[in-house]
Amino acid sequence: MSDIVEKTLTALPGLFLQNQPGGGPAAAKASFSSRLGSLVRGITALTSKHEEEKLIQQELSSLKATVSAPTTTLKMMKECMVRLIYCEMLGYDASFGYIHAIKLAQQGNLLEKRVGYLAVSLFLHESHELLLLLVNTVVKDLQSTNLVEVCMALTVVSQIFPCEMIPAVLPLIEDKLQHSKEIVRRKAVLALYKFHLIAPNQVQHIHIKFRKALCDRDVGVMAASLHIYLRMIKENSSGYKDLTGSFVTILKQVVGGKLPVEFNYHSVPAPWLQIQLLRILGLLGKDDQRTSELMYDVLDESLRRAELNHNVTYAILFECVHTVYSIYPKSELLEKAAKCIGKFVLSPKINLKYLGLKALTYVIQQDPTLALQHQMTIIECLDHPDPIIKRETLELLYRITNAQNITVIVQKMLEYLHQSKEEYVIVNLVGKIAELAEKYAPDNAWFIQTMNAVFSVGGDVMHPDIPNNFLRLLAEGFDDETEDQQLRLYAVQSYLTLLDMENVFYPQRFLQVMSWVLGEYSYLLDKETPEEVIAKLYKLLMNDSVSSETKAWLIAAVTKLTSQAHSSNTVERLIHEFTISLDTCMRQHAFELKHLHENVELMKSLLPVDRSCEDLVVDASLSFLDGFVAEGLSQGAAPYKPPHQRQEEKLSQEKVLNFEPYGLSFSSSGFTGRQSPAGISLGSDVSGNSAETGLKETNSLKLEGIKKLWGKEGYLPKKESKTGDESGALPVPQESIMENVDQAITKKDQSQVLTQSKEEKEKQLLASSLFVGLGSESTINLLGKADTVSHKFRRKSKVKEAKSGETTSTHNMTCSSFSSLSNVAYEDDYYSNTLHDTGDKELKKFSLTSELLDSESLTELPLVEKFSYCSLSTPSLFANNNMEIFHPPQSTAASVAKESSLASSFLEETTEYIHSNAMEVCNNETISVSSYKIWKDDCLLMVWSVTNKSGLELKSADLEIFPAENFKVTEQPGCCLPVMEAESTKSFQYSVQIEKPFTEGNLTGFISYHMMDTHSAQLEFSVNLSLLDFIRPLKISSDDFGKLWLSFANDVKQNVKMSESQAALPSALKTLQQKLRLHIIEIIGNEGLLACQLLPSIPCLLHCRVHADVLALWFRSSCSTLPDYLLYQCQKVMEGS
């Protein structure tokens, strides 16, 4: 922005306070605050809405008199306009001031114009008739030499100008694209963007100028042009492929920090500009390999650089992932994007978890197996307290549904549907359930029961296409006629059972579906006669809670059944009661039924059995009525008018006053959206108002799915619910509709779950049911032990998924202690866990099959316990949980040297054990605390080194370690030093043992001290611990391996691709031994046996087999979490080496 513009905008606030009556700025300020301020203070002091309305009406009356007075000056008008704006903001009508706002924008000076334009943009809308009076003012200001006037005119044009006024200002705005000031060019581009939104045809001739704006020397102008290009590329991406290089170049400059600093947001370079460019690239590269290759490098760079812990960087990462999966795929980018999604999903922050689920929902279409890595996290999200997380999780499950997990996913959707009260959620989920049921239904019974639940819960708010599609499916059937008949018969039996239930209320659309099905297919029944079905339908017809439209469906069903019944007193009674009905529609149907009932042969020919899906030959020209039409015209009947002609006449008469009294309404048909089957089957040949019906359908409001509240009879719900309240209708019980859905949970052997908590077993089984069918089908049979678990609703005895990470039902067994681990050289950097306060940006992801663990006690006693979610520390997105970037302070060389010397001396004493590097966990100008780990045979030894960096003594230095839920600190919980000498270092040791299996946890604490007996300070720190810190090698023989293998029930399998450096099995096993502390028991040909233990004595066994360049891993343990965790670590090791 130029200096002139900055000075002008800086001076604007002062203009509000100058040239006011009273002689100076102080008086002006007092005048302004005394009127507007007193109004605000008066309103805030009120205690009721009535008092507020009374005060505002008094103020509006005063303002109306003031603005209408001829003696009111423009300065006074400006102040009145500000008060009018405030009253309008509170919701009160101030339309008398609209014309004065336009006058103020036309006549005032710079400040008064600004207030006038502001009031106009807030008061008027695009269709307001007074807006026409503003056109000349805007044209004049666009031609002004004053920069601020031009900007104000461009702003109001982009806010409220309709498409009819575009030609008056378009040439002037085009000229402003060449203006010397960048702020004018930017506002001109935004105004053209508004024109493109409301009237794209009027700006097609200036597309070449949009390209010039894209290449503008000012970043703001270029950024404004991206709005236009994003919309145009959405409409036609092929026409802008040649600009891909330009967009890539711009994104490279933005990511590389080449833009001015004022475009940065929290040290992130132009984040919103990056997001728009990523969206544009995603549209351009879709299904285009050549174009996508141009953007691979910049997308890789964007993923790499977006590492700051800030919300806006998460938004950039999300858009990067979206773009990577939108363009032509590249394996390296897909892997990085998948890791990024994992960090989002596993984040404890709700917003980031939602972003992860949103991204996972999108990319799951390209890679369904990606959900397997986060299956237990998804299970946890199903019970998340945040409804948005729940809803997005259900959307994710909807995307991964297949024929094998359909029953469990639909059950979860129905459970959420019963709990939800939001209409939008109900409509959305009901549509998804109906779609899945039709696509993947395992059998007829499940399909009918599921659709019954959909109709019951969805009620009358569901989209009308859902029941229509269901009825069409029943009518058209499949290729197998026998299966079609079975489906129809089950539907009829199900509906008769539901109708037998007493005091149950069914939605109107559900009743309509029942009536149609019973009318069409009741002939399939063996035990029930048509007379019995008619009696049940008649009972519904006499229920006052049934709407008129539903009664039309019911009487149509009765009409069809009457042709099949021999004789029925119920039909005679129905005809007698409804031929005198006040409802004209029902009276018409009753008379039709009466005449057809008198001629049985005619009824059977008109209503044949099972002919609902037959194709009918329709004479669209209605040529058979030519004689009837000629006769009517000869007798003076009005000629036919096309729908458009009648619509024009109707519109021309809308504003004409009606001086005739309204006619009395004899009855109401009650039809609002869908025509009844009776009207289709019985009245199609005799209807005389087909043209009017077509006009209503095409030119009237579409009210399908909208509850009708008012009609000619008055308030409809009130009348329809008169008897409903008396009858005490109850909702449909879920057991009667979905009696078999709960069978989707697989049965397990009771002996295997004696020591496992019920909730954890349900989660494990739910995971295996939800994510079945997503991986490749392969498995390995080890030591002659075959899988025996069967699944009731699956068509195969067992679906073996190599990549699904399924876990079988588990049982805990008492394990004896084994020999201690061997001394193996491990890589320190692999085990040095990220600390919370160090600002480390290494991203970590733990994709575990289970995060809630059931295991035996660390003593040798069995333990049946449910581990709550809060006991597990889910890894955050960026290793540390805070959102701030840590900048370590400068420490003195002496203190660092002393600390390093002490650490080195202590590590020399423990050279027989593996240890990590020392890492600083917290510091300030006075003190520094570092920590490192020593992996002993029987425990984890944590060492904290405290350094006094100042030249003064510290009094009462106290280092306190808080007890953790999953850990046991065997040493003293804290240590206090009465005096800590200047520039000295002290070291404290704590032995940490695991009490409960976990995925990742924290040891937290603080260091407090006093300086000179007066100043007290405290620093908090946190050290991250993972399960790998408590893994040790387990030395056993091959015979012991075989015995333990057969006794363990928790297993997980996965195929991992080997790199060239790991082509041989020994080298691959050596890598696992070094990285994961596994003990190699034996290598036999292309198979290998390894073992480890979780301290103190929970063993885990690994069987490896090489197939070409694929390493098949099979873990088994008595702990349900350990195999999943080690499998994930093995994948990381094999992919990273």
UniProtKB/Swiss-Prot annotation:
Effect seen on changing S623P: In STUT1; uncertain significance
Pfam families with a match to the protein in the record: Adaptin_N, AP4E_app_platf
Keywords: Golgi apparatus, Hereditary spastic paraplegia, Membrane, Neurodegeneration, Phosphoprotein, Protein transport, Transport
Residue list for modification Phosphoserine: S700, S857
Protein transport is among the record's keywords: yes
Topology within the bilayer: Peripheral membrane protein
GO MF, one example: cargo adaptor activity
InterPro entries registered for this protein in UniProt: Adaptor_Complx_Large_Subunit (IPR050840), AP4_complex_esu (IPR017109), AP4E1_C (IPR028269), ARM-like (IPR011989), ARM-type_fold (IPR016024), Clathrin/coatomer_adapt-like_N (IPR002553)
GO cellular component, as recorded: AP-4 adaptor complex; endosome lumen; trans-Golgi network; trans-Golgi network membrane
Region spans: Interaction with TEPSIN: 727-1137
Disulfide bonds: none
Listed GO biological process terms: intracellular protein transport; protein localization; protein targeting; vesicle-mediated transport
Claim: Membrane is one of the keywords in the record: yes
Role summary: Component of the adaptor protein complex 4 (AP-4). Adaptor protein complexes are vesicle coat components involved both in vesicle formation and cargo selection. They control the vesicular transport of proteins in different trafficking pathways. AP-4 forms a non clathrin-associated coat on vesicles departing the trans-Golgi network (TGN) and may be involved in the targeting of proteins from the trans-Golgi network (TGN) to the endosomal-lysosomal system.
UniProt subunit comment: Adaptor protein complex 4 (AP-4) is a heterotetramer composed of two large adaptins (epsilon-type subunit AP4E1 and beta-type subunit AP4B1), a medium adaptin (mu-type subunit AP4M1) and a small adaptin (sigma-type AP4S1). Interacts with TEPSIN. Interacts with GRIA2; probably indirect it mediates the somatodendritic localization of GRIA2 in neurons.
PANTHER family, per database record: ADAPTIN, ALPHA/GAMMA/EPSILON
Homology family: Belongs to the adaptor complexes large subunit family.
Protein name, per record: AP-4 complex subunit epsilon-1
Lineage: Eukaryota, Metazoa, Chordata, Craniata, Vertebrata
Record gene name: AP4E1
